[in-house]
Curated annotation (Swiss-Prot):
Belongs to the bacterial ribosomal protein bL33 family. GO terms for molecular function: structural constituent of ribosome. Gene3D superfamilies: Ribosomal protein L33. It holds the Pfam family Ribosomal_L33. It comes from the Bacteria. Keywords: Ribonucleoprotein, Ribosomal protein. GO terms for biological process: translation. This is Large ribosomal subunit protein bL33A. One of its GO terms (cellular component) is cytoplasm.
Length: 55
């Protein structure tokens, strides 16, 4: 089972505009200790928006 100290945990990316959680991905905690922020397409907004890691 996955532990809380997993090196590559699953994270969800939420749109900064509409706050919908649209994407699930993995990240490497050693390379990206801060919250991940990517520009992805938001199907709810219909445009490319900034998506940020949410809990």
């Amino acid at each position: 089972m996955a532990s809380s100290t997993d090196v590559r945990p699953k994270i969800t990316l939420a749109c900064e505009v509409c706050k919908h959680r649209n994407y699930i991905t993995k990240k490497n905690r050693r390379n990206d200790p801060d919250r991940l922020e990517l520009k992805k397409f938001c199907p709810n907004c219909g445009t490319h928006q900034s998506h940020r890691e949410s809990k």
